[in-house]
Amino acid sequence: MLNIFSLICLNSALHSSSFFFAKLPEAYAFFNPIVDVMPVIPVLFFLLALVWQAAVSFR
């Protein structure tokens, strides 16, 4: 079971590393600034939730 799990993790890590370094086709080159910001969006939602909870005194 552990071998299957490690194989899945290793396989996804190899695919994701090549995915991060892929370039957009020339027709979509104007989306590059948006694509660069997209990985930060979940962090912004986390910070929004933290500020919201601070505003309501962490009820």
Swiss-Prot record:
Assembly and binders: PSII is composed of 1 copy each of membrane proteins PsbA, PsbB, PsbC, PsbD, PsbE, PsbF, PsbH, PsbI, PsbJ, PsbK, PsbL, PsbM, PsbT, PsbX, PsbY, PsbZ, Psb30/Ycf12, at least 3 peripheral proteins of the oxygen-evolving complex and a large number of cofactors. It forms dimeric complexes.
Compartments it resides in: Plastid, Chloroplast thylakoid membrane
Record organism: Calycanthus floridus var. glaucus
InterPro entries: PSII_PsbK (IPR003687), PSII_PsbK_sf (IPR037270)
Protein name from the UniProt record: Photosystem II reaction center protein K
Residue ranges of the propeptide: 1-22
Keywords: Chloroplast, Membrane, Photosynthesis, Photosystem II, Plastid, Reaction center, Thylakoid, Transmembrane, Transmembrane helix
Gene Ontology CC annotations of this record: chloroplast thylakoid membrane; photosystem II reaction center
PANTHER family: PHOTOSYSTEM II REACTION CENTER PROTEIN K, PTHR35325
Domain of life: Eukaryota
Membrane topology, record value: Single-pass membrane protein
Transmembrane segments: 38-58
GO biological process annotation, one example: photosynthesis
Chain's role: One of the components of the core complex of photosystem II (PSII). PSII is a light-driven water:plastoquinone oxidoreductase that uses light energy to abstract electrons from H(2)O, generating O(2) and a proton gradient subsequently used for ATP formation. It consists of a core antenna complex that captures photons, and an electron transfer chain that converts photonic excitation into a charge separation.
Main location as per UniProt: plastid
Entry's family note: Belongs to the PsbK family.
